[in-house]
């Protein structure tokens, strides 16, 4: 009998922790990202910021906007604008579905994390709905309660 293939943890490069706090994530999609030669070197070094980023569907193409990838320190002439829009590589039906979902009021696409998979940079895009302030407080209260329960269980054993 063949052994089960164990999945390695993703080679995580960056994570957008603020997105989980500010948004309710409805669905996620994995997308490739079109990068230039020096950009991929900076990404592999972990020199990127997803915090203010978002994705947009334009002309039946998905674009990642407002994501900062620092210029590669050795790239000089070949470096590009750190804040440029980057194309997301998705199937046509996925782009069409995302376009329909984001057409609703209050729904947006946010990058959740960027990682390497088989040598290629991938972005996990979340279809997100904005939280209200009372929702954020409610989430924090629930997390505090869960933490207290875990402490009590840990002290018990």
UniProtKB/Swiss-Prot annotation:
<comment type="similarity">
    <text>Belongs to the SmpB family.</text>
</comment>
<dbReference type="InterPro" id="IPR000037">
    <property type="entry name" value="SsrA-bd_prot"/>
</dbReference>
<dbReference type="Pfam" id="PF01668">
    <property type="entry name" value="SmpB"/>
</dbReference>
<dbReference type="InterPro" id="IPR023620">
    <property type="entry name" value="SmpB"/>
</dbReference>
<dbReference type="GO" id="GO:0005829">
    <property type="term" value="C:cytosol"/>
</dbReference>
<dbReference type="GO" id="GO:0003723">
    <property type="term" value="F:RNA binding"/>
</dbReference>
<comment type="function">
    <text>Required for rescue of stalled ribosomes mediated by trans-translation. Binds to transfer-messenger RNA (tmRNA), required for stable association of tmRNA with ribosomes. tmRNA and SmpB together mimic tRNA shape, replacing the anticodon stem-loop with SmpB. tmRNA is encoded by the ssrA gene; the 2 termini fold to resemble tRNA(Ala) and it encodes a 'tag peptide', a short internal open reading frame. During trans-translation Ala-aminoacylated tmRNA acts like a tRNA, entering the A-site of stalled ribosomes, displacing the stalled mRNA.</text>
</comment>
<dbReference type="GO" id="GO:0070929">
    <property type="term" value="P:trans-translation"/>
</dbReference>
<protein>
    <recommendedName>
        <fullName>SsrA-binding protein</fullName>
    </recommendedName>
</protein>
<keyword id="KW-0694">RNA-binding</keyword>
<keyword id="KW-0963">Cytoplasm</keyword>
<dbReference type="InterPro" id="IPR020081">
    <property type="entry name" value="SsrA-bd_prot_CS"/>
</dbReference>
């Amino acid at each position: 009998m063949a052994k089960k293939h164990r999945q390695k943890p993703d080679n995580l490069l960056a994570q957008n922790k603020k997105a989980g706090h500010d948004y309710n994530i409805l669905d996620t999609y994995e997308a490739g990202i079109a990068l230039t030669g020096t950009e991929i070197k900076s990404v592999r070094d972990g020199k990127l910021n997803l915090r203010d980023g978002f994705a947009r569907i334009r002309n039946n193409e998905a674009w990642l906007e407002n994501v900062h990838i620092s210029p590669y320190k050795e790239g000089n002439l070949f470096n590009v604008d750190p804040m440029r829009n980057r194309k997301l590589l998705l199937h046509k039906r996925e782009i069409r579905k995302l376009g329909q979902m984001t057409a609703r009021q209050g729904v947006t696409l946010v990058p959740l994390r960027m990682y390497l998979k088989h040598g290629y940079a991938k972005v996990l895009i979340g279809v997100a709905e904005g939280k209200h302030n009372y929702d954020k407080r409610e989430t924090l209260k629930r997390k505090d309660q869960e933490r207290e329960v875990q402490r009590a269980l840990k002290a018990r054993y």
